[in-house]
Amino acid sequence: MERESSKLTRLSVLPQLKIQLQDVRPEGIPNKREIHSIWERKIDLDLNRTYLVRGASGRGKSTFLHILLGIRRNYSGQVLLGEENIRRFCSDKWALIRQNTLAMVFQDLRLLGELTARENLSIKTRLAESPQSKQIEELAERLGVKEQLEQPCHLLSFGQQQRLAILRALLQPFRALLLDEPFSHLDPDNSRICLDLILEICEERNAGLFLATLDDDYGLNPDQELRV
């Protein structure tokens, strides 16, 4: 395990870590090969680039992000991180990847409703060994949720919870940020504020971005658009 952890630490700081999809087809996705779809093709992705993931409901946007994060395994084909097949990663290796390499904002947010907003944020930063109370305050103020930090999450609006989930992801180390329809309950102004902060932090870290959306591109100018 010690050798594997050391290997992952070295892997996570490579300047151009790549993901390759090789003929991937998730179970439950219609078996219909389309010209512009990412399914059943060879696709090379760089973790320091920006991608817009588009598709209608049920076409696999969330599934694609879940495959990258290693939480969905029922698919045919292969996914390589670096030169390694992610199916062969053990649970400890995935835990390290999710702490240091890939961060995600889930569509259902996955906040703990009985805890305060600050407690939800602090749990994640403690797990990532990066206590950042001052940064929490600063970023929460930028996203307009500083006044809600001491409130239980279940009392917040879904839009406020979305901003907290975005903040939680930004506070952890990452090489790429996976966003699953993160602005669905935000007005255009708050969506723009969130996206500006996301792009700013990604640029500071030379990190990549995968933004899944039904249709709206939120003004993002991606390096590549991916269709599912």
Q: Which residues make up each language-model segment?
A:
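Helix-to-loop junction immediately C-terminal to a conserved catalytic motif
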Residues: L69
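ABC ATPase NBD coupling module
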Residues: I86-A103
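Q-loop/switch helix immediately C-terminal to the Walker
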Residues: D108, E114-L127
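Hydrophobic anchor residue at the start of the ABC signature
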Residues: I166
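Catalytic Walker B motif of ABC-type/P-loop ATPase nucleotide-binding domains
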Residues: L177-E181
